Amino acid sequence: MGLETEKADVQLFMDDDSYSRHSGVDYADPDKFADSGSDRDPHRLNSNLKVGFEDVIAEPVSTHSFDKVWICSHALFEISKYVIYKFLTLFLAIPLAFAAGILFATLSCLHIWIIMPFVKTCLMVLPSVQTIWKSITDVVIAPLCTSVGRSFSSVSLQLSHD
């Protein structure tokens, strides 16, 4: 139908002087960040996220719209997806990344400094607690249960129909 299926390749070239002058940050190794644009999802965390036109909108063979409608809807889908995604990431990506960083830093701090020491302390104290609990059970609960069991074992019931 005349649709272009190849992805557009966009590159931005800046010399080192203008890059460090405009950004205000002097990165130690610019080559480290040079390839970061090629694969931003190396662990395939979002592999199930299908946002291609063919993955979202499909017409069966028996019902096809006009070719011009299909081409225009495909173009409008791609343009709106591109523009809206860029717009949303422009305003939401940095605050959400900041919030996620705070959240993960807080959870990491809690895990490292509170939860794991508490778990290790419980595991350290557990054998002593187990010994004390066994002693209390043997001294108090076992004789009590034995005496209650003997008392109820001597009870006999007889039912009579009058």
UniProtKB/Swiss-Prot annotation:
In its keyword annotation, does this UniProt entry include Cell wall biogenesis/degradation? no
PROSITE patterns assigned: CAVEOLIN
- Chain ranges sitting on the Cytoplasmic side read 1-86, 108-162
What GO molecular function annotations does the UniProt record carry, in alphabetical order?
D1 dopamine receptor binding; molecular adaptor activity; protein kinase binding
Q: Where does the record say this protein resides? A: Nucleus; Cytoplasm; Golgi apparatus membrane; Cell membrane
Intramembrane segments at which residues? 87-107
Q: How is this protein positioned relative to the membrane?
A: Peripheral membrane protein
Q: Which positions bear Phosphotyrosine? A: 19, 27
Q: Which residues cross the membrane?
A: none
Q: Where is the signal peptide?
A: none
Task: Extract one GO BP annotation from the record.
Answer: cell differentiation
Q: How is it modified after translation?
A: Phosphorylated on serine and tyrosine residues. CAV1 promotes phosphorylation on Ser-23 which then targets the complex to the plasma membrane, lipid rafts and caveolae. Phosphorylation on Ser-36 appears to modulate mitosis in endothelial cells. Phosphorylation on both Tyr-19 and Tyr-27 is required for insulin-induced 'Ser-727' phosphorylation of STAT3 and its activation. Phosphorylation on Tyr-19 is required for insulin-induced phosphorylation of MAPK1 and DNA binding of STAT3. Tyrosine phosphorylation is induced by both EGF and insulin (By. similarity).
Q: Which residues carry this modification: Phosphoserine?
A: 20, 23, 36
Q: Which domain of life is it from?
A: Eukaryota
Which of UniProt's keywords are assigned here?
Cell membrane, Cytoplasm, Golgi apparatus, Membrane, Nucleus, Phosphoprotein
* Main location as per UniProt: nucleus
What cellular component terms from Gene Ontology apply here? Answer: caveola; cytoplasmic vesicle; Golgi apparatus; Golgi membrane; nucleus; perinuclear region of cytoplasm; plasma membrane raft
Subunit composition and interactions: Monomer or homodimer. Interacts with CAV1; the interaction forms a stable heterooligomeric complex that is required for targeting to lipid rafts and for caveolae formation. Tyrosine phosphorylated forms do not form heterooligomers with the Tyr-19-phosphorylated form existing as a monomer or dimer, and the Tyr-27-form as a monomer only. Interacts (tyrosine phosphorylated form) with the SH2 domain-containing proteins, RASA1, NCK1 and SRC. Interacts (tyrosine phosphorylated form) with INSR, the interaction (Tyr-27-phosphorylated form) is increased on insulin stimulation.
Q: What does this protein do?
A: May act as a scaffolding protein within caveolar membranes. Interacts directly with G-protein alpha subunits and can functionally regulate their activity. Acts as an accessory protein in conjunction with CAV1 in targeting to lipid rafts and driving caveolae formation. The Ser-36 phosphorylated form has a role in modulating mitosis in endothelial cells. Positive regulator of cellular mitogenesis of the MAPK signaling pathway. Required for the insulin-stimulated nuclear translocation and activation of MAPK1 and STAT3, and the subsequent regulation of cell cycle progression.
What's this protein's family per the entry? Belongs to the caveolin family.
UniProt-listed PANTHER family: CAVEOLIN, CAVEOLIN-2
Q: What is this protein called?
A: Caveolin-2
Q: Which organism is it from?
A: Felis catus (Cat)
Protein's gene: CAV2
